[in-house]
Amino acid sequence: MRAVEWWEFKLSPTLAIAYATAFLSRIPISSLWPQLLVMLAALALCAAYASVINDLTDFNDDQASGKVNHLVGKSRSFIIAALIGCLLLGIAVAVYWRGEILLVSLYLASWISFTLYSLPPFRLKTRGVSGLLACASGEHLFPSLLAVTMVSWRVGAFDTIWFTSVATWSLSYGLRSILWHQLSDLPNDEKTDLGTFARRHKTTWLHRFGNFIIFPTEAASFCLMLWRAGSPLAVALLCFYALFEALRKRLWGVNLVVVVPKAGYHILMQEYYQLFFPLALLLSSSSRYPSDALLIAAHLFLFPRRALQALKDLKVFVYALKVIMTRMRGRRLSAPKKL
């Protein structure tokens, strides 16, 4: 069910929002572990459902364009069982949350968004901007607001500024993510004449749209989130992330992109949202509530890929720094003395 494509990329930032909401509300994140597990399982079910119906409805187009489809070789009974299993378990989660209307509504909204995006006769994927909004909402907006609502429900308090800033950020980030995805799929979509938003507009226009409208909105709302959450460590790790990417650019020529893919690129802020932001909040909360430190190991166990890659890169940077320092010392030692 393509879990490798969505597990860490979509669920880790959503958990980070839950951590941030708890930190803002001044409650131990560890006290929420049962709710966090239920939310994680619920969103994983929804993402698995989205993957299955997307591959199912794209099957013929993928075959025609030569794109990989994960349902190739799967029996009809397997596909039906996977869909029914996801739906039944999703309904069970909705029943479990039945006491909170907003929580259930946000959860069901993600399912509806994915259904409208993929399934005919709606198939918003081929209807331009409607497809962008449906996918961005299902993947990022509704899950992020679900995380805020779940923690707020547990605390018994609702922060309107926080809710609004998270909504703006998650929708903007979701739009940027689906635009990047559609641009990456552009060669395949052109072969089958698939009418996605990216196919209906010139790449130069999409570049400007992403760089000068979507990303500034995302960045502004995220700055508001950082201010509201009140974690200095989250800001410090943002600066560290910027240095990290600058070193990658310097050593390996890695390009940072907003929406339009390039050779050897990283998507701007993706690593921060997936790795550094949740870790910053867990570490910040641990200074108030030492038991929250246990969740750091749990989070890294669930989402190890980004952390392992960052650790490998950091080792290279440290080695490069040692080489530079050694060379600088060697030059000083060999420099002629002043008379």
Give short role names for the model-derived ranges.
Residues 1-339:
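Multi-pass alpha-helical membrane architecture of UbiA-family
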